[in-house]
């Protein structure tokens, strides 16, 4: 299959490209200069779409700029999907995010949800919605790994927020399996093999990656006054919006994901070993 992979240089995209190529697909991964979703060039985009059987959109950004999120997650994919339909592309696979919804008040999930709906209105679209993704090189994952080294974890609400992290290898395997399936217009949550609190997740990483005993966890009661600064310094990575996402939790039923993989997705305590083995 000829596949145009958007976001192929990103964290998830790199793993998707490797897995899809290993499955025998011809994968085109345009650079930002060749295809920039912040300012689409129609001629360049149509050239990239020509001759493709499928498009996989793995573009996702965190930003404090809501307009930028709307452009990259919603308007650009909608336009590309229309051009893809005109080019005869048969299907589109959208890598979204768990909880994405057009009406979500958090700009990241709202823009993702609106993009999902806009693309699906144009052509047959499978949507996958990963939970918090673990994998070396991912910005949020590396932040968690650095935090896990600390002997004292000072976390919002004491780290009681519930997560169900998924390994990027499982995300890549799931995308490859979905493209190989005959179904169209599937919506699939991708969550890992075990749900646990943020504090427990960090201590799991601490044990499996750093070989250390559990850290002491204390609540962080006075973060709110500093959120405008952390939002600016992290470009949206640490903000009131991300804290709300944490508070809402990131867990989902993974029975359909398990069926697609043909096995249970990895649990957090298995992540480090999977890193050693690789794909």
What is each model feature region?
Residues 1-23:
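N-terminal Rossmann NAD(P)H-binding glycine-rich loop of SDR-like oxidoreductase domains
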Residues 37-79, 83-86, 98-102:
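NAD(P)H-binding glycine-rich loop region in Rossmannoid oxidoreductase-like domains
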Residues 96, 117-137, 146:
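Conserved beta-loop-beta element that borders a ligand/cofactor-binding pocket
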Residues 131-163:
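NAD(P)-dependent short-chain dehydrogenase/reductase
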Residues 139-140, 158-180, 186-189:
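Substrate-positioning beta->alpha
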Residues 162-169, 188-208, 217-228, 264-267:
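Substrate-binding strand-loop-helix patch
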Residues 205-249:
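Terminal hydrophobic/aromatic helix or amphipathic segment near a protein terminus
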Residues 248-279:
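Amphipathic terminal alpha-helices
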């Amino acid at each position: 299959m000829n596949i145009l992979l958007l976001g192929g240089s990103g964290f998830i995209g790199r793993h998707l490209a490797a897995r899809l190529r290993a499955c025998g697909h011809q994968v085109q991964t345009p650079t930002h200069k060749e295809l920039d979703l912040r300012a689409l060039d129609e001629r360049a985009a149509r050239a990239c779409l020509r001759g493709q059987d499928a498009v996989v959109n793995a573009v996702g950004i965190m930003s404090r700029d809501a307009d930028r999120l709307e452009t990259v997650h919603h308007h650009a994919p909608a336009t590309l999907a229309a051009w893809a339909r005109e080019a005869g592309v048969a299907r589109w696979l959208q890598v979204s995010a768990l909880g994405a919804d057009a009406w979500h008040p958090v700009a990241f999930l709202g823009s993702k949800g609106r993009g999902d709906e806009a693309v699906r209105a144009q052509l047959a679209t499978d949507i996958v919605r990963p939970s918090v993704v673990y994998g070396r090189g991912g910005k949020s994952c590396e932040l968690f790994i650095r935090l896990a080294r600390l002997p004292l974890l000072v976390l919002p609400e004491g780290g009681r927020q519930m997560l169900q992290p998924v390994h990027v290898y499982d995300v890549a395997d799931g995308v490859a399996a979905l493209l190989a399936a005959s179904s169209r217009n599937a919506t699939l949550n991708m969550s890992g093999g075990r749900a646990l609190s943020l504090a427990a997740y960090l201590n799991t990483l601490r044990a499996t990656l750093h070989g250390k005993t559990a850290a002491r966890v204390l609540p962080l009661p006075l973060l709110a006054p500093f959120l405008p600064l952390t939002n600016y310094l992290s470009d949206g990575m640490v903000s009131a919006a991300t804290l709300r996402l944490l508070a809402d939790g990131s867990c989902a039923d993974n029975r359909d994901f398990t069926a697609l993989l043909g096995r249970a997705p990895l649990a957090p305590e298995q992540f480090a070993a999977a890193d050693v083995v690789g794909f």
